[in-house]
Swiss-Prot record:
This is Lipid droplet assembly factor 1-A. The gene is ldaf1-a. It comes from Xenopus laevis (African clawed frog). GO terms for cellular component: endoplasmic reticulum membrane; lipid droplet. Residues 64-65, 109 are lumenal. Its main location: endoplasmic reticulum.
Length: 162
């Protein structure tokens, strides 16, 4: 039993020496020295229970704070993607609405153009008929609103003979 106990004590002393070397390396670092020379560092050096409590608190709070920051980052990314998706949907709906309005205007413009063409052809035919009638009435010597005194053309002669 004594040999096992001696072996345990030797390993503990060796581990303690290694820990002391690590502590000296850490304490010799310039930033650690500056912190330990500050009033807060001196207070923590004089109150080990507060130091241990603060160390445990910081260690344990790292996980929830990390999860919270991950949640914030995930939410920000999700919001950005949602804004892009919503913006895409709004632009798509607006584009479809614009396309429908422009198609309706195109159909309406075709209808208006057709009505204007029919009106032009009908009006032109009526005016040509009225002009031809007045020419025939004016050449026969009848009193009418317009009395034309000119020589008759072959078209008028053929019209009169029929």
């Amino acid at each position: 039993m004594a040999s096992a106990e001696n072996l345990y004590q030797e390993k503990m002393q060796e581990l303690q020496k290694q820990m002391n070397k690590v502590m000296q390396t850490i304490n010799n670092h310039s930033k650690v020295e500056a912190f330990l020379n500050s009033p807060f560092g001196q207070y923590l050096d004089q109150h080990p229970f507060v130091t241990l409590s603060l160390l445990v608190f910081i260690s344990l709070s790292a996980v929830p704070v990390g999860i919270f920051l991950t949640l914030i980052a995930g939410t920000a990314i999700a919001v950005c993607l949602a804004v892009l998706i919503i913006e895409g949907i709004v632009i798509s709906v607006g584009g479809i609405a614009l396309l429908c309005i422009l198609c309706g205007l195109a159909v309406m413009s075709l209808g208006v153009a057709a009505v204007l063409c029919v009106s032009y052809v009908a009006g032109s035919s009526v005016l040509n008929y009225i002009h031809a009638y007045r020419v025939t009435v004016g050449t026969r010597g009848r009193s009418g609103p317009i009395s034309l005194n000119h020589e008759t053309t072959t078209a008028e002669k053929s019209y009169r003979s029929s």
